[in-house]
């Protein structure tokens, strides 16, 4: 074989080898691409419960399950305080950012819907098929809607009840099996429970703890007192304040007198929020408070030595003596929403659906003792129905009424919260403070009145 022939043979073989390798490499490209890890979607989840250790643990456990079931979704946690959540979400949503999924007290729903701060979930709800929403109590589902569209999904649903420390009852000579049924009895109990327990000559335990700070939690503590006195916040058509009624004035005076006249509430009430009042209960500085399913586990977490799950008892909210009002307490309802700014609405819906599923709602009760807006949980879950606190709360739902569902409600309740604070501090008399709140609320509601509509004076 000549040198020339050999050279061409070698070149031919090299070229063939190159083409073979190149073809194999190119042929392998689709396979390699298909094996690449899928792109992750990150959802920002925001909830005030993340600031509560027992809830934080429960939520993190749940998200491990969710991420395992949805490997293309990762959850990023965004902590917010209960008192700051509305301000935070409003500011962020207005700026075009904010969490993908967030949690609110139901009284903010109307305001957030009106302002366009929530994503329309209707297509997702309808895609779940007929009967999907039948698992929830109808009144809770209705509050999530506007004009037939769904803008949120219900979460916790509970009545406010009276919690008390049975050991402090016994020390004061009271029978824990006989909680007060009327506000007169309640005051009598509170006076006996307000005493010096350590013998230093100074009061160190008070009968009752409540909220006096300007705080969203005020509504849940004052409303049972108002309703159980037969009062209302607004007229039946929601066009005028109803604080000028004798029932409302009596309720506000009673609330104020607990602090300023009878002194059965610890000093410094105007600085107290839900968290600090629960801490007072954990420290045995107070013997009674108004709360709901969240109260025992939080108090227990604040002071495990108290053994709150055993020491605390629950009872119906007292009523005005000689009356039997149809509604004697208020209902707490929370809502899960999707931000209108989310870039991943389908994935956000999957998270909301997961959070509000039957299995997760059972977990929330098991871990945080909150009742559910799902009938197949609050009405059927054996562990809930046998719990000493939950069965009282569930029974009181028949006597619980929601506050008026208006977008102006946050402004309205703040006016009443301010009136309570003014009367506590002595800046105004209870009557004057309530009158000013009455006038302020009528001003807020003027948008709903025509020139012929007149509101009664105070």
Segments predicted by a language model, with ranges:
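Extracytoplasmic/periplasmic substrate-recognition and gating elements
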Residues: 64, 68-69, 74, 172, ...
């Amino acid at each position: 074989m000549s040198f020339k022939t050999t050279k061409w043979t070698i070149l031919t073989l090299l070229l063939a080898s190159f083409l073979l390798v190149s073809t194999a490499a190119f042929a392998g490209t689709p396979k390699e691409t298909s094996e690449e890890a899928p792109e992750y979607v990150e959802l920002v989840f925001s909830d005030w419960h993340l600031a509560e250790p027992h809830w934080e643990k429960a939520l993190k456990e749940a998200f491990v399950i969710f991420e395992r079931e949805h490997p293309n979704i990762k959850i990023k946690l965004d902590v917010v305080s209960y008192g700051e959540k509305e301000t935070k979400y409003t500011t962020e949503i207005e700026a075009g950012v904010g969490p993908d999924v967030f949690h609110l007290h139901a009284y903010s729903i109307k305001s957030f819907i009106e302002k366009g701060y929530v994503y329309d979930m209707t297509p997702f709800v309808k895609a779940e098929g007929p009967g999907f929403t039948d698992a929830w109590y109808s009144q809770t589902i209705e509050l999530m809607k506007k004009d037939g569209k769904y803008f949120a999904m219900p979460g916790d649903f509970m009545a406010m009840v009276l919690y008390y420390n049975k050991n402090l009852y016994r020390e004061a000579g009271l029978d824990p099996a006989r909680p007060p049924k009327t506000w007169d009895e309640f005051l009598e109990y509170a006076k006996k429970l307000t005493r010096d327990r350590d013998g230093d000559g100074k009061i160190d335990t008070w009968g009752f703890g409540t909220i006096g700070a300007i705080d969203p939690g005020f509504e849940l503590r004052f409303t049972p007192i108002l309703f159980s006195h037969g009062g209302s916040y607004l007229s039946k058509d929601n066009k005028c304040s109803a604080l000028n009624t004798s029932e409302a004035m009596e309720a506000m005076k009673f609330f104020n007198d607990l602090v300023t006249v009878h002194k059965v509430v610890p000093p410094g009430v105007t600085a107290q929020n839900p968290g600090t009042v629960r801490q007072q209960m954990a420290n045995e500085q107070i013997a009674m408070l108004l709360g709901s399913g969240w109260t025992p586990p939080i108090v227990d977490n604040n002071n495990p030595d108290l053994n709150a799950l055993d020491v605390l008892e629950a009872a119906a909210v007292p009523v005005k003596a000689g009356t039997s009002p149809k509604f004697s307490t208020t209902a707490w309802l929370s809502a899960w929403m999707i931000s209108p700014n989310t870039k991943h609405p389908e994935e956000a819906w999957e998270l909301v659906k997961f959070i509000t599923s039957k299995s997760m709602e059972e977990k929330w009760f098991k871990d945080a003792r909150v009742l559910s807006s799902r009938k197949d949980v609050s009405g059927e879950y054996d562990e809930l129905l046998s719990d000493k606190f939950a069965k009282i709360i569930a029974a009181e739902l028949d006597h619980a009424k929601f506050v008026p569902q208006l977008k102006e409600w946050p402004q309205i309740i703040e006016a009443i919260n301010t009136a309570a604070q003014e009367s506590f501090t002595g800046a105004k008399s209870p009557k004057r403070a309530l009158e000013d709140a009455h006038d302020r609320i009528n001003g807020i509601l003027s948008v709903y009145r025509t020139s012929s509509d007149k509101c009664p004076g105070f």
